[in-house]
């Protein structure tokens, strides 16, 4: 992957994503849906989904596939791939080599955002697409992305089956006779900027924040991103997928699922060696909040910290519940004590809360 000569940041990343000063990362689009992205720990995400499935008694994978299907359609609605839908469905007009070329567009994106290396196995126009991904992770996310892209190209409903064998993911997409019956709650959130803004130090050549270029390494051959501090694998994950998952679970189970998400993320964040250590309280929180912002998780509109307590207002968190849980985990790591949260406001697009040491 070609890198910026000044900061080492991948040039493809600079062309695909915009690191905004409000703590969000946007996928650059020419029209169509605006997509918000976050740089997340792949194992932590998988742990979140696995823990949710175990606690609620059923797998959330099918919800992730459906949510990501819509994200996949939105992403590729303005890429070269959709023009294939104007080409008649036949072996003469849609030979396999042409489809492989189109899938290469998706494959380069998949590789760039850390999900592995894509290979097309077979294709029949209007009927099926079989492919596999080496060094894959978060299988439902990948399956949903390719399902959405395939439906966009073919212009008909499709269905997907997938299986993991080690780190190789096999995906089989076939035409479906069923209409799209996706729930309206699986819509994509609109992205709005917060009031606060960070003045990042940016590379003069590519415009990327200098600190993010120093935080992570890219392995273009294996299609992976590595956090230099932890050695963990990171991925660029669509924020709208997470929020669609939460809406669906709230509809099926009720609002209590928020507490399950919160408690699970606190536990996972405490396990991960990502909390910065600093002697001064202000320096600690400045560093920690900046790290979350650089990963596209948002930045508070207001933040106050005291002895064993923090109070936050935020309007652009990647997910309000999960962001609050990360703050709680950081406080617990700093104090060595468990914490309690009091929500003053808890909407999808804005929240206010106080977190303090448990008494």
Spans of model-derived segments:
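C-terminal regulatory/effector modules of DNA-binding transcriptional regulators
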Residues: 316-321, 327, 338
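Low-complexity, intrinsically disordered Gly/Pro/Thr-rich segments
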Residues: 155-160, 335-344
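N-terminal accessory segment detector
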Residues: 1-141, 159-313, 318, 344-352, ...
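Short, non-transmembrane amphipathic alpha-helical segments
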Residues: 141-156, 324-335
């Amino acid at each position: 992957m070609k890198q910026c000569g000044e900061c080492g940041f991948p040039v493809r990343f600079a062309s695909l994503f915009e690191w905004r000063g409000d703590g969000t990362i946007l996928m650059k689009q020419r029209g169509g849906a605006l997509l918000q992205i976050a740089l997340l720990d792949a194992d932590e995400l998988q742990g979140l989904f696995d823990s949710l499935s175990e606690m609620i008694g059923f797998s959330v994978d099918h919800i992730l596939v459906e949510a990501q299907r819509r994200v996949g359609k939105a992403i590729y609605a303005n890429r070269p791939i959709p023009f294939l839908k104007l080409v008649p469905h036949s072996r003469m007009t849609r030979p396999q080599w042409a489809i492989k070329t189109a899938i290469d567009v998706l494959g380069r994106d998949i590789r760039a955002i850390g999900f592995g290396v894509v290979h097309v196995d077979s294709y029949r126009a209007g009927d099926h697409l079989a492919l596999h991904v080496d060094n894959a992770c978060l299988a439902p996310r990948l399956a949903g992305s390719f399902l959405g892209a395939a439906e966009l190209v073919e212009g008909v409903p499709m269905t997907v089956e997938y299986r993991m064998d080690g780190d190789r993911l096999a995906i089989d997409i076939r035409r479906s006779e069923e209409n799209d019956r996706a729930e309206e709650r699986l819509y994509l959130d609109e992205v709005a900027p917060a009031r606060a803004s960070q003045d990042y130090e940016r590379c003069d050549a590519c415009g990327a924040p200098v600190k993010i270029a120093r935080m992570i390494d890219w392995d273009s051959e294996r299609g992976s991103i590595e956090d230099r501090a932890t050695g963990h694998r990171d991925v660029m994950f669509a924020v709208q997928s997470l929020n669609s998952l939460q809406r669906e679970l709230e509809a099926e189970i009720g609002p209590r699922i928020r507490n399950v998400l919160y408690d699970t993320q606190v536990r996972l964040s405490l396990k991960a060696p990502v909390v910065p250590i600093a002697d001064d309280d202000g320096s600690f929180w400045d560093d920690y909040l900046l790290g979350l912002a650089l990963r596209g998780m948002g930045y508070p509109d207001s933040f106050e910290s005291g002895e064993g307590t923090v109070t936050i207002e935020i309007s652009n968190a990647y997910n309000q519940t999960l962001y609050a849980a990360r703050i709680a985990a950081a406080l617990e790591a700093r104090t060595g004590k468990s914490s309690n949260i009091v929500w003053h406001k808890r909407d999808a697009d804005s929240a206010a809360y106080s977190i303090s040491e448990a008494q």
